[in-house]
Amino acid sequence: MATKQKIRIRLKAFDYKLIDQSAAEIVDTAKRTGAIVKGPVPLPTRMKRFDILRSPHVNKTSRDQLEIRTHQRLMDIVDPTDKTVDALMKLDLPAGVDVEIKLQ
């Protein structure tokens, strides 16, 4: 039995609206070219928290708390055609979205 080729796309961004818009654009492009798309699956949001001293000298108890959230989405394109790969390469995504593509 031959194994099917699969493209795994992982998106990361700080803004969830931007990542959902990009995921919808990728799904639409892949479906238009006749590929089967599984996803987008929302992965757990990673939160990094930082404590920063407000005062440069004294008042150690006075601090600011900052956090940055990294949203992630995962999708698989099963049995892609050459047309699908070309369309995905030509796709223009916003600057705030990090895209990782693996061919399996």
From Swiss-Prot:
Record keyword Ribonucleoprotein present: yes
Keywords: Ribonucleoprotein, Ribosomal protein
Cellular component annotations (GO), alphabetically ordered: ribonucleoprotein complex; ribosome
InterPro entries named in the record: Ribosomal_uS10 (IPR001848), Ribosomal_uS10_CS (IPR018268), Ribosomal_uS10_dom (IPR027486), Ribosomal_uS10_dom_sf (IPR036838)
SUPFAM superfamilies: Ribosomal protein S10 (SSF54999)
PROSITE patterns: RIBOSOMAL_S10 (PS00361)
GO molecular function, one term: structural constituent of ribosome
A Pfam family: Ribosomal_S10
GO biological process, one term: translation
Transmembrane segments: none
Family: Belongs to the universal ribosomal protein uS10 family.
Function noted in UniProt: Involved in the binding of tRNA to the ribosomes.
Assembly and binders: Part of the 30S ribosomal subunit.
Annotated protein name in UniProt: Small ribosomal subunit protein uS10
Species this protein is from: Polaromonas naphthalenivorans (strain CJ2)
